[in-house]
């Protein structure tokens, strides 16, 4: 291994149950990973109130400096964080799954929301469990390992839709046995890599980690260009809006530009639906209006939702595949910007299609005030964070009053290269949210 990672392994079983096969596997694998130089944490429920109190004291002590929880973890015995007590629930003659207390979920959310991890590796992430809660709150690359070949009626039948919605966040899935892979594929179709619960598991996991990490975008920009831009003034930019050249908007270009100037916007991206004429008209009037205009288009693909091309010059026809649309944006020297990626009220690419174009995505919209549910924006933040994608925001305004309700504060730029460098250090300014805009 040439690269060392920060990794949290999460088990749903109380850590005291070391006779449990999954816990035994986690203990052996994490010890090996730590010995190989990785920074490893184990998150587990516990029956010990003292262990839970000790872990929470450590989390509180590390607030503001959460790296303390990882530093020193690269040793033969990784740090174990007891995230809370599990409550055994009995129901007549049948034993029901352990209940997950609110305190456990909050502790996991706090920990994973503040500590920087490369991977969250969840074992048996069925609901309700600590593993499932970790998957819900993770902002890292996620691996799900499935060990048992026993049918779980609660997760596969009663709570299937709920469980499946979070399994979409898994970037890789492994199964310990062929029977396990077959069972999981039956209920939750996907590719399951075989990783047996034996001495070679840690090496196989490392290979998966390296493969997934290679898909992340580079954090490094252009230092010389960054230094050049740092001397430029900060401007507010709205990256998503419409004019009356869109079928569902009645805002004239002149009104759009006047309102943008009045709202203090230094630059705007005009992104009409399947049309570029409004953006070209706006750019022609930009100097007089005192607002810089990025020519864009929000293109409806055949079956994979919408994607925005920024800094383009020619209209891209609707109805192409997602890959064809992206290729056309790139042919024009433009930038691929993914709007409202997880808003199920819009036509959006699903997780699988986003991964297929990941290498060509330049930026992703993480805040859109017109989404119906705020969790859609949260999901976009997670996706951008895990793959290190530059984050953007825009009002998606269809009426002039909505302009600037979401904006980016960034150093002034000329052209796509300077724009991307400036975007790396930009600040997202979130305003009011409304479906009316």
PLM regions: where:
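Nucleotide-activated donor-dependent transferases that construct or modify glycoconjugates
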Residues: 2-19
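A conserved catalytic-core segment of Leloir-type glycosyltransferases
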Residues: 2-4, 32-119
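Short amphipathic alpha-helix
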Residues: 21-33, 205
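Short His-centered aromatic/hydrophobic patch
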Residues: 101, 122-127
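Active-site proximal beta-strand in glycosyltransferases
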Residues: 119-121, 132-152, 167, 174
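Membrane-proximal helix-turn-helix segments that form the acceptor-binding/catalytic region
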Residues: 150, 156-173, 187
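Helix-loop-beta element that forms the nucleotide-linked donor phosphate-binding surface
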Residues: 181-197, 203-209
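Charged catalytic cores and adjacent phosphate/nucleic-acid-binding surfaces used
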Residues: 214-239, 243, 247, 253, ...
